[in-house]
């Protein structure tokens, strides 16, 4: 999928710095164990300030618009090293491209996150040229690569329910914190060592000056556990089962409703195939765009492609003439035209349940005011029949459909781009 802001390669200077950090050692000192970084550098909300001398970059993991990510060894105060994902940004390039605000916003958002499905900022380091953010390393790669490994390059419905439900919980938390994600796509959903998701890449996210003040609304239910709002699921799977009375009256329990997030934007940002109609048309947008992207995300996991991918039609030319986008391809313009004017069409194959299709239709409503979740937030999405049987309070206790193999020691003395030592054809972030 084409991002609106094109990724750029690392400068030669940064490459030389990375290789300088590699040094002349014969191999990596990483022992293959995924020791939680917080044990060595602390889980402080602001992240610990480290020296560049504490870092050793050992492998390229990927690149984005404002920086590149490396697998890095972080020197432990007790001796030895631990592994982390290091996002390296060239401060001169950020200034030249007017991207300093995006880098600063991502840092502030990472500092604010405290949720099992979202990354924590473990630490940072910088000098006169480079700025580095250290977050948790996810050895399972991302959902885009994992989808490529599935039969027919798509997930079964049970797997989709698992991944979508965890994404809903993560975005619900962000909305409560006043954050609009704006960049949901399989490439940005990582798989942790336990098989659960972790959303990443927040440089396109938008944060309100103040967190949302969640309203409370009653929800009649006959099962207390089903109504728990899973903003930060942390209930142990090993507690003794509570004994509830066999007969109990229906009661009304409070639910968090954080929508809409108190911030609006007219920015044209995101990945083409995931853009909401209100972004394409330039009408201004709010948190409802995240629920649109959830619909596109769910469709892609089920069918293996996005619902509005550019095809030959007569709409895109008018749209292109009315919008000043010199760097947007005709294919992308057709995609944008489809987003604005074409309804979602479900293929005959594979067979997908009516509940899944109904949820996607609700999320892909063109009018953001009528979009599922736009006004009542995640609780109304959670109550959709597609999620029947999901215990939101114990969502972390569900067995994932895929658990990555234990991360093994790799000979990092090889070229930084040599992936031949990996057991699986996945990208690491």
Where are the regions a protein language model picked out?
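Protein kinase glycine-rich loop
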Residues: 57-69
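A short, aromatic-enriched beta-strand patch in the conserved N-lobe beta-sheet
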Residues: 123-124
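Glycine-rich ATP phosphate-binding loop
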Residues: 68-93
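Intrinsically disordered, low-complexity regulatory segments that flank or precede the catalytic domain
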Residues: 1-52
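A conserved loop-to-beta-strand element in the N-lobe of protein kinase catalytic cores
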Residues: 119, 128-136, 144-145
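C-terminal regulatory tails of eukaryotic serine/threonine kinases
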Residues: 215-250, 257, 374-429
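Activation segment signature within eukaryotic-like protein kinase domains
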Residues: 163-164
């Amino acid at each position: 999928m084409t991002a609106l802001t094109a990724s750029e390669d690392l400068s030669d200077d940064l490459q030389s710095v990375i290789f300088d950090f590699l040094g002349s050692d014969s191999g990596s000192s990483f022992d293959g164990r995924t020791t939680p970084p917080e044990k060595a550098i602390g889980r402080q909300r602001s992240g610990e300030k480290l020296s560049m001398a504490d870092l050793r970059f050992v492998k390229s993991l990927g690149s984005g618009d404002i920086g590149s990510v490396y697998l890095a060894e972080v020197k432990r105060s007790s001796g030895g090293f631990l592994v982390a994902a290091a996002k390296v940004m060239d401060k001169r390039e950020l200034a030249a491209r007017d991207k300093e605000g995006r880098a600063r916003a991502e840092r502030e958002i990472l500092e604010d996150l405290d949720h099992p499905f979202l990354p924590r900022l473990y630490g940072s380091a910088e000098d006169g040229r480079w700025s580095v953010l250290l977050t948790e390393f996810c050895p399972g790669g991302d959902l885009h690569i994992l989808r490529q490994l599935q039969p027919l390059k798509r997930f079964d419905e049970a797997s989709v329910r698992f991944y979508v439900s965890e994404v809903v919980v993560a975005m619900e938390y962000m909305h409560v914190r006043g954050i609009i994600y704006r960049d949901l796509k399989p490439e940005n959903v990582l798989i942790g060592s336990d098989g659960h998701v972790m959303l990443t890449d927040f440089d396109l996210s938008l944060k309100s000056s103040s967190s949302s003040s969640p309203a409370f609304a009653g929800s009649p239910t006959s099962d207390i556990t089903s109504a728990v709002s899973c903003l930060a699921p942390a209930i142990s799977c090993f507690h003794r089962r509570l004994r509830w009375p066999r007969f109990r009256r229906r009661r009304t329990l409070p639910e968090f409703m954080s929508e809409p997030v108190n911030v609006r934007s007219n920015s044209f940002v995101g990945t083409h195939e995931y853009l909401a109609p209100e972004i394409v048309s330039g009408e201004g947008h709010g948190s409802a765009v995240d629920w649109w992207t959830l619909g596109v995300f769910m469709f892609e996991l089920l069918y293996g492609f996005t619902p509005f991918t550019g095809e030959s039609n007569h709409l895109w030319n008018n749209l292109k003439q009315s919008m000043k986008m010199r760097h947007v391809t005709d294919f992308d313009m057709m995609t944008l035209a489809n987003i604005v004017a074409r309804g979602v069409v479900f293929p005959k194959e594979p067979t997908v349940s009516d509940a899944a299709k109904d949820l996607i239709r609700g999320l892909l409503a063109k009018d953001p005011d009528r979009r599922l979740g736009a006004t009542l937030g995640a609780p109304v999405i959670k109550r959709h029949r597609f999620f029947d049987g999901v215990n939101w309070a114990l969502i972390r206790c569900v067995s994932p459909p895929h658990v990555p193999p234990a991360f093994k020691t790799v000979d990092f003395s090889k070229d930084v781009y040599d992936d031949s030592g990996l057991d699986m054809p996945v990208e690491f972030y």
